[in-house]
Amino acid sequence: MIKILGEGKGKEILKSLSEKLDEIVKKEIGNVNTNVILVSKDQIKEMNREFRGEDFPTDVLTFPLFEEVYGEIYICPEVVEENAKEYNNTFEKELIEVVIHGILHLAGYDHEFEDKNAKEMFEKQHIYVEEVWNEWRSSLSGGTGQEGT
């Protein structure tokens, strides 16, 4: 089961998609508890420095815990919004992109090296993002899928 914690832009979007995101977690990992935590730019920068040795804010950090809560996905809506503008994307689609990315990291996928695992990760990410994005747009328009484009 996915829990959406913290505060920030996108929380309601993620809550509305929690069932669909939970389906992806179950498919990729199993029936586990996962937290998606929205944090500020300062918080994620500090976490990135502490855990990765990188002194800049990032959009998503994933931490497997393998306990009652299987893992936590930290998302910084401010960086997501900046990335959306940079990549000519909507905030909503970029948010879906990073949460799916985090789920796949929890499932054991990695992209640090250009290998089969990275290729498979990004292929799955693309499929899941389109699936979730289309479902979200459809929910906005009463089932026609025409809103939010």
From Swiss-Prot:
Organism taxonomic ancestry: Bacteria, Thermotogati, Thermotogota, Thermotogae, Thermotogales
Record text on cofactor binding: Binds 1 zinc ion.
GO biological process, alphabetically ordered: rRNA processing
Protein name per the record: Endoribonuclease YbeY
The UniProt record lists the keyword Nucleus: no
Annotated localization: Cytoplasm
Gene3D superfamilies: Metalloproteases ('zincins'), catalytic domain
EC category: hydrolase
Obligatory cofactor(s): Zn(2+)
A GO cellular component entry from the record: cytoplasm
